[in-house]
Amino acid sequence: VKTKSNLDLRINSVLIRRGRVTYDILSEPETPGKFNAHHLSVKNLAATLSLKALRSDSLNAAIRRVSFDEQCGFSLQKFAMKVTANNKRLDIKDFGVELSNTALKIDSLTLKYDSLPELPQMTENVRYDGSLKASVILKDLAPFVPALSRFEEPLDLNLVFSGHGKHLDCPTLQLANHHGLMIAG
């Protein structure tokens, strides 16, 4: 006999300062200067998290700040977002990522669905919309894709999107660099 969960959890704040996390699978080879999920070494970990409410049918949480440096050279200066969700809708607000020379911002992202199990499969019933603004220097991603290490020019991206399931509509797509190149569609 299944019983309904009475889950009701609240955590006002979790603070992490000057944290350090290492993870090694000793049987796997190391790849200095390149991200390797088998050998992680995170230092200067800082986080401010808040779980306003977690219930069996809803979530309200905020990541005010997460930052760290990873041994491969990747540095997350700031990650932040607010998320609310229930059985029919997920809202992400003030999503932001800042790297050494890169900033990405999504003011709001909304996903609507008929039931929560549909969300991971992105069925046709899952509808979404949002907008994204970013200034990216691809070199910041070189620890994951070494070929990007030579790309030091900023690229500005502006994107407005919506869709359902795996169908994406982008009425606004602009990509520009600081030398006058602009691609719009």
Regions found by a protein language model. Give the residues of each.
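Elongated, acidic membrane-bridging lipid-handling scaffolds
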Residues: V1-G130, V136, E152-L155, F161, ...
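Short, recurring structural edge motifs at helix starts
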Residues: K2-S5, V145-P146, P171
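Extracellular loop and loop/strand-boundary signature of outer-membrane beta-barrel proteins
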Residues: P32-G33, P143-A147
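A low-complexity, Ser/Thr/Gly/Pro-enriched, surface-exposed linker/loop concept
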Residues: S135-P143
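Nuclease catalytic cores
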Residues: I183-G185
